[in-house]
Amino acid sequence: DAWNKSGGISVTSSTDEFEFKYGRFTVGSDIAGTTTGRNICTVAGNKGIDVTGDDQYSKGPYVTASFRVRSDLNVRARIRFERYNSEGYTFLCDAYLSLQTHELQITGGNAQLLTANFEIDPGSGWIYFQATLKCLPEWGMVGTQLQIAADRAVGSFATGDWIEVTTPQFEYGACATSFIITTTEPATRASDLCKFPLMKNMYTMPFTFMVEVHKNWFISHNAAPRVIDSENHQSGGPFIMGFGSSGTISQDGYSYCDIGGANRRVYESCGVRDLVMGFRVKADGMTCSFANKHISTETKTVWKYIREAAVIRIGGQTTTGLRHLNGHIKNLRFWNRALSDTQLKEYV
C-alpha cells in the first residue's frame, strides 16, 4: 500500500485471484492535459544500486527493473533509469510499453545499453514488463522510476486514465528474480540444482544429449549460465552445456557445449528464450552443439570415457549459485548413439 507515487494520481488497492495485491492508479483532473510521465513506484538514484563495486564483476554490470501492469486504455507503462554521482542526478534512458497496442519503445541517450521485453498472461490480463540496463562504473549509483505515461498517439493525460500495477522489483543482475508471496517479508528464491550419476547411464562414445530449456532472461546474468555441468570428471573431460555471455548484446546468450575441449556454439540462439538444445558426440569423437534446428560445425573431442565418480549437475554449477541457469528445464533425454542431423532439428 505504501506507493511513493506522484501527486495528481489517486490509488486504490485490491487483491487478484492469485493473491497478488495490486494498485489501480487513476489520473486526476488537476493533471489532465499534461504530458509528463507520473511515478508509480521509485528508487531514487542516491538510494539505488552501486554499480562501481566488486558486485559489478561477479553479477555483471546490469540492473533490472520489472513490474506487472494492465489497463483497458492505451496508456503506457514506462521504466526510467537515472544515475547519481558527484555531478548529481542524470537521466539515462526509458523503456515504454503501450498497454493495448503492445508497442515497445526505447529512448534516451543510453538507449543502446537498454534491453526491454514483455510477456502477456492471457488468463489474468497481466503484462509482465522488464527492462535491463548495462551500467558503466562512472555512473556511481543507478535508480529507477516505474511510471504511467500518456497514450503516445494522444500525447497528454485525460482525467480518468488508469493503470493497474503489481510486483514492482528493482535489483542487481540481468534478469528479475522469482517473486514469492509470504506472510512476513518478501523473499526471492535461488535457482534449483540437482544431480545424477553418469556411471551406469553412459560410458563411452557415441552419445547425444537433448533437453528443452526456458530462460528467465535475455541478457546473461553471469559468465556462463549452465544447463548441465559435470562434477568429479577426469582431467580434461568436463561435460558442459549452457549459454555464453558477450559484451555485445546482440551476441549474448548463445548456446554452446564444451565436451573435453570441443567447444561448439550456436549463435542463432541469441535472444531466444525457449529452446530445444543439446550436443552430439559421434563414435569418432566429432562433436557438435545444436539449438532450435540450428547445428554447429563439428570438432573432435579429447574425451574418451566416464570416470566412476562423475555426476551431471542440472541447472547450475555449484550449490552456492555460481553460474546457475535461472530458468526451467524439462525432457532431458540421453541416447547411447549419435542421432542424425534430422533428429537433432526439434524446436520449440
Listing of model-derived features with the role each one plays in the protein:
Residues D1-D274, F279-F290, H294, V302-Y347:
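Extracellular and organelle-lumenal recognition/adhesion modules and their flexible linkers in secreted
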Residues T297:
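ATP-binding pocket architecture of kinase catalytic cores
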